[in-house]
Amino acid sequence: QIALRKQGYPDMECQVVLTDEGSDTALLKVNQPLPSYLPVRERGYDLLGEQITTLGFPLTGFGSQLQVTQGNIAGLQGIGNDIRFMQFTAPIQPGSSGSPLLLPTGEVVGMVTHTIANTQNMNYAVKYQLLSALLTSCGLNVSELTHNISQTPLSTPQITKQSKSALWLVGCGA
């Protein structure tokens, strides 16, 4: 059993709609409307060096509150020049998988997937282009997910405040 969890809300059961083992991603469906969602970047430009913020729920055994980290996009390819991934420097821990990488505009440009143990800044995320393709393949219109893009850069506290209502912990089991 998979459920979305958030303090102050009842758990929402969800089903796996699509998985992509190669990129370590899954698309989940809930049978009720979510209060909000994050805008996904539609168009590309060179993201190398861009500041990013990650928001997620790592190491939930130590606490289930939202955690915020910052860094930069350090590389535009993954291990072995895999173009599905980008490398970033924001610190992550076990349980960070699925966390969004957000630009200062509040747009999702990636989703955390993995890190290389015992290294520094060897963290990877699936690029927004693959996320957009997965959403589109399930009949979702990504251009409708651009409602909340700031025209001016936001501070990290502003990004956090704007985004946190759309973030839920994905839990397995009772």
Regions found by a protein language model. Name each.
Residues 1-63, 81-85, 140-149:
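Conserved active-site neighborhood of the chymotrypsin/trypsin-like protease fold
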Residues 1-2, 13, 36-37, 58-64, ...:
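C-terminal cap/linker of serine protease catalytic domains
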Residues 14-16, 73, 101:
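Conserved hydrophobic positions within beta-strands
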Residues 19-21, 44-47, 65, 79-81, ...:
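Extracellular/periplasmic catalytic domains that process cell-envelope and extracellular macromolecules
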Residues 25-29, 68-72, 85, 167-169:
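Conserved hydrophobic/aromatic beta-strand scaffold that supports enzyme active sites
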Residues 66-77, 124:
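Short, compositionally biased
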Residues 91-112, 124:
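Catalytic nucleophile loop of clan PA
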